[in-house]
């Protein structure tokens, strides 16, 4: 099953992809959005074309048949705040109106349409001669254009006037100042897809510009500025001169009404530059904005425009990249700007060294550096900061807009990492005033496609997916392929689904279940839980585990919130029922996906079961911890909580496990502690239990004569316990790897009652005192023959040591050797005290491990000492 099928299966089981939630995405990534007001070009687009001070003829509110002059006080999208002329500074009569619904007309409309122009009642007595008042107040007045009012009345935004098919004039910004007609193919929120007049869509010369781009103008601009209309050099070769002139003549004959010039009133005003030919500077190549390189002013067109060429020291036959600039063009810097800002400057192609030096380069070229005064002042006050999110145009694929993260800010320039791009690209450099960047949500608002990172895709959770195990056994090939894909994909799913989205948590019921959990009940659990929110998924997992325990209240106590916790997660109240009593305790659960794997592992260790019993990884036929060699009677050798140097709880640090049935009056005298809990803190936990809680480990211990760490050790064996004993006996029979019978093998030949008695005695010998040496039978080594080594252990690597440990019955300890990077030399130096201290092992496992180390030492002296 491939990755796509896996994703589809997930969606079908309870997850469906929905629109991107920016609030959730920002929370997951730990970032913030760039403030909306930082994008001036977008803010301008939202203006309705009106400006404070404009005058209109407006219907009088108390008498709709009459009209009067009103002044625009302020604007807010489609709303205007108006004040009738004559009220002066009195704001009490100000009123709001909706442009699309109100009767608003330009000055002179009433006279043309023979409508009554009369002052409202509230001010009629203030002025004696209203005709003279109007003549004075309308001197120099500005009124909105008629097309604007008509368009707004029809529900159209001013920007909507730039409709597909509209014509504009576009300057060639690559190598010359030639201007040519372009046709609007698409307008998405002011971002225009343009096609040169005379070309078809199949010619692949369409390009994107924002409508306020300084190189885009209304039709007639070239004639006003004295520029000739001619196709840019990039497309000139596609037709001969006669064909281009024919196209131009056809456009002029059609005489379409040009787009109103007021649409471009907010365009940047081009100032006068002071650059001269042969000046050197630093520049960002607009066609490849991924670095800063040396460049040269190669041509000055006029007082407003000049041509910059990226330096290239290779032979002349290489194509040169140039672009037209003006005084305020972004992406050009004075010499040494990169050095002053701690940035790397890329040497020009053909430069003999990777270490570029401006002084040597200027001397070599015989050129001068452009003085600082030629460059516009940098914008120091802006709201762009590192790790903020925005939307940005992909400079390689201009039709694509991606989510972007600001990775660096230098003055008024940003380094952006685009996420979710069809083709991965390096960080690109843009100005804070670039018209190719937009606030988060711009694409969604304007219907523009947005490329989002995979981990940002939000899935709506119908319910936490619980996959039940199949009753029908599939073919072995299908099973193995499916499991392999799940194992490969499980580690990636944490990042794919976001910071707070937990991957599937698998219950690997074939793994060692430890002393608290019933193997039979675990086998009945769902195959997996999730994916979904970390807290919800892990809460469900822990609830299922608690219910699969011999004593749910005991497992709940093991899982309860610890004051020394390092997870910094959230506390969730979980419940357990045992023998008619309800218990609840606060359990800490991690909130982020990156901690799920370790949380599951540590929880398994806390419950003294195989670290792979549950987690994001599905175990195949063989567990990596080699837990199949373990039985319930041996759990103390391998897994257990490791509370370093902590004897009992601190004062007041009692268990937070509370019983729903408070029976303080029935509190009995606690019996002598014959069976001390294996956890060091348990005795203190008993002493400090609140009066309202059941005594001992939450209350159930007082009622049971079989008080031990494990309900399976009780006198009255239940059906689950018998099943457990039978499973362990079968496991021991399959194991049989030694010439002499092992302790577990001997137990299989005994009657069930003998087995139970034997199990109790053996386990009690460990839970009585964890530092008490085990009996000789208990530490009996299954493989006692002399060890023969194929290589010198002094030269073993960490991997060699781990490989050897995994081959023994101490396989679960191999991870410690890997984590502590114990190689062959370190292995030969280990002794029982150092093993106990450094590896934090109990005496039983430490003795068993040291036995294997002694075997290695003996073989070393015998085979390699000479």
Swiss-Prot record:
Among SMART domains, the record links this protein to: MBT, SAM
Where in or outside the cell it occurs: the entry states: Nucleus
Q: Can you say where the MBT repeats lie in this chain?
A: 20-120, 128-232, 242-348, 356-453
Which residues are annotated as modified residue Phosphoserine in the UniProt record?
767, 775
Domain SAM: from-to ranges: 796-864
> Which keywords does this Swiss-Prot/TrEMBL entry list?
Chromatin regulator, Differentiation, Nucleus, Phosphoprotein, Repeat, Repressor, Spermatogenesis, Transcription, Transcription regulation
Q: In which tissues is it expressed?
A: Expressed in all cell lines and normal tissues tested, including the thymus.
Please give the superkingdom of this protein's source.
Answer: Eukaryota
Span list, region Antigenic epitope: 34-42
GO BP field: cell differentiation; chromatin organization; negative regulation of DNA-templated transcription; negative regulation of muscle organ development; spermatogenesis
Effect upon mutating residue 196 to A: Reduced histone-binding
Q: Where is the composition biased (Polar residues)?
A: 683-694
- Regions of biased composition (Basic residues) lie at 663-682
Where does it sit, as one GO cellular component term?
Answer: nucleus
Against Gene3D superfamilies, the record matches this protein to: 2.30.30.140, SLED domain (3.90.1150.190), Transcription Factor, Ets-1 (1.10.150.50)
Q: Where is the composition biased (Acidic residues)?
A: 699-713, 721-730
Instruction: Please name the GO terms that the record assigns under molecular function.
Output: chromatin binding; histone binding; transcription corepressor activity
Residue segments, region Disordered: 641-777
Note the InterPro entries from the entry.
Mbt (IPR004092), MBT_SFMBT1_rpt2 (IPR047352), MBT_SFMBT1_rpt3 (IPR047351), PcG_chromatin_remod_factors (IPR050548), SAM (IPR001660), SAM/pointed_sf (IPR013761), Scm-like-4MBT1/2_SAM (IPR037604), SLED (IPR021987)
* Record's compositionally biased regions (Low complexity): 737-749
Main localisation: nucleus
The domain-related comment in the record is: The MBT repeats mediate binding to histones tails; however, in contrast to other MBT repeats, does not bind specific histone lysine modifications. The MBT repeats lack the conserved Asp and aromatic cage at conserved positions.
Record's function text = Histone-binding protein, which is part of various corepressor complexes. Mediates the recruitment of corepressor complexes to target genes, followed by chromatin compaction and repression of transcription. Plays a role during myogenesis: required for the maintenance of undifferentiated states of myogenic progenitor cells via interaction with MYOD1. Interaction with MYOD1 leads to the recruitment of associated corepressors and silencing of MYOD1 target genes. Part of the SLC complex in germ cells, where it may play a role during spermatogenesis.
Query: Subunit arrangement?
Result: Interacts with MYOD1. Component of the SLC (SFMBT1-LSD1-CoREST) corepressor complex, which also contains KDM1A/LSD1 and RCOR1/CoREST. Interacts with KDM1A/LSD1 and RCOR1/CoREST. Interacts with L3MBTL3.
Q: What is this protein called?
A: Scm-like with four MBT domains protein 1
What species was this sequence derived from? Homo sapiens (Human)
* Lineage of producing organism: Eukaryota, Metazoa, Chordata, Craniata, Vertebrata
Instruction: Please name the gene that encodes this protein.
Output: SFMBT1
């Amino acid at each position: 099953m491939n990755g796509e099928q896996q994703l589809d299966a997930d969606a079908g089981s309870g997850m469906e992809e929905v629109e991107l939630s920016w609030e959730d995405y920002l929370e997951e990534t730990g970032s913030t959005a760039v403030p909306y007001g930082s994008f001036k070009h977008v803010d301008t687009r939202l203006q309705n074309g009106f400006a404070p001070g404009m005058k209109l003829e407006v219907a009088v509110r108390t008498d709709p048949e009459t009209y009067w002059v009103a002044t625009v006080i302020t604007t807010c999208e489609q709303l205007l705040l108006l004040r009738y002329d004559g009220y002066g500074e009195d704001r009490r009569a100000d009123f709001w109106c909706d442009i699309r619904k109100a009767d608003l007309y330009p000055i002179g409309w009433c006279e043309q349409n023979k409508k009554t122009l009369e002052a409202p009642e509230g001010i009629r007595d203030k002025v004696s001669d209203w005709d003279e008042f109007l003549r004075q107040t309308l001197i120099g007045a500005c009124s909105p254009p008629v097309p604007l009012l008509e368009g707004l009345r029809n529900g159209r935004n001013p920007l909507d006037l730039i409709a597909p098919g509209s014509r504009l004039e576009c300057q060639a910004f690559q190598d010359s100042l030639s201007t040519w007609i372009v046709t609007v193919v698409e307008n998405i929120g002011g971002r225009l897809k343009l096609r040169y007049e005379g070309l078809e869509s199949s010619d692949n010369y369409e390009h994107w510009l924002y409508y306020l781009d300084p190189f885009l103008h209304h039709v007639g601009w070239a004639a006003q500025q004295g520029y000739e209309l001619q196709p840019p050099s990039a497309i000139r070769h596609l037709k001969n001169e006669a064909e281009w002139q024919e196209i131009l003549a056809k456009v002029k004959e059609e005489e379409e009404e040009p787009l109103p010039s007021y649409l471009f009133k907010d365009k940047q005003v081009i100032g006068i530059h002071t650059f001269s030919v042969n000046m050197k500077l630093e520049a960002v190549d607009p066609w490849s904005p991924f670095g800063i390189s040396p460049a040269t002013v190669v041509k000055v067109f006029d007082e407003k425009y000049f041509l910059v060429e990226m330096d290239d020291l290779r032979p002349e036959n290489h194509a040169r990249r140039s672009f037209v600039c003006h005084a305020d063009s972004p992406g050009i810097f004075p010499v040494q700007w990169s050095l002053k800002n701690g940035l790397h400057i890329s040497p020009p192609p053909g430069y003999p060294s990777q270490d570029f030096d401006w002084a040597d380069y200027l001397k070599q070229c015989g050129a001068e550096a452009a003085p600082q005064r030629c460059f516009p002042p940098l914008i120091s006050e802006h709201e762009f900061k590192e790790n903020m999110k925005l939307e940005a145009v992909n400079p390689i694929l201009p039709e694509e807009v991606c989510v972007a993260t600001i990775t660096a800010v230098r003055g008024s320039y940003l380094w952006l990492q685009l996420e979710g791009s069809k083709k991965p690209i390096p960080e690109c450099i843009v100005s804070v005033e670039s018209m190719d960047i937009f606030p988060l949500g711009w694409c969604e608002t304007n219907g523009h496609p947005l490329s989002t990172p995979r981990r940002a895709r939000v899935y709506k959770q119908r319910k936490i997916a619980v996959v039940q195990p199949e009753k029908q056994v599939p073919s072995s090939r299908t099973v193995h392929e499916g499991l392999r894909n799940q194992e490969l994909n499980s580690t990636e799913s944490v990042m794919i689904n976001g910071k707070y989205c937990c991957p599937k948590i698998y219950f690997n019921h074939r793994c060692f279940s430890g002393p608290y959990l019933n193997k039979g009940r675990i086998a009945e659990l769902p195959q997996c839980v999730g994916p979904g929110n970390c807290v919800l998924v892990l809460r469900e997992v822990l609830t299922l585990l608690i219910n699969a325990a011999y004593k749910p209240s005991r497992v709940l106590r093991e899982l309860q919130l610890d004051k020394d916790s390092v997870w910094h997660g959230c506390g969730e109240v979980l419940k357990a029922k045992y023998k008619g009593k309800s218990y609840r305790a606060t359990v800490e659960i991690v909130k982020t996906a990156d901690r799920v794997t370790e949380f599951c592992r540590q929880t398994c260790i806390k419950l003294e079961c195989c670290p792979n019993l549950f987690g994001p990884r599905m175990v195949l036929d063989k567990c990596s911890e080699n837990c199949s060699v373990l039985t319930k009677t041996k759990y103390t050798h391998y897994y257990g909580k490791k509370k370093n140097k902590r004897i009992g709880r601190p004062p007041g640090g009692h268990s937070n496990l509370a019983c729903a049935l408070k029976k303080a009056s029935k509190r009995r005298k606690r019996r002598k502690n014959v069976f001390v809990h294996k956890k060091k803190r348990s005795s203190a936990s008993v002493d400090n239990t609140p009066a309202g809680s059941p005594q001992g480990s939450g209350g159930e211990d007082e009622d049971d004569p079989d008080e031990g760490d494990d309900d399976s050790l009780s006198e009255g064996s239940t059906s689950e316990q018998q099943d457990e004993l039978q499973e362990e006996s079968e496991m021991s029979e399959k194991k049989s790897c030694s010439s002499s019978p092992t302790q577990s093998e001997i137990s299989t030949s005994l009657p069930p009652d003998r087995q139970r008695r034997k199990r109790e005695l053996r386990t009690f010998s460990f839970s009585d005192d964890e530092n008490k040496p085990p009996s000789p039978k208990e530490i009996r080594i299954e493989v006692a023959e002399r060890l023969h080594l194929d290589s010198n252990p002094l030269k073993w690597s960490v991997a060699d040591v781990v490989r050897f440990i995994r081959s023994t019955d101490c396989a679960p300890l191999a991870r410690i050797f890997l984590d502590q990077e114990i190689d062959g030399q370190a292995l030969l130096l280990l002794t029982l005290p150092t093993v106990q201290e450094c590896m934090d092992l109990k005496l039983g496992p430490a003795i068993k491990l040291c036995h294997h180390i002694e075997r290695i030492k003996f073989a070393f002296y015998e085979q390699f000492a000479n």
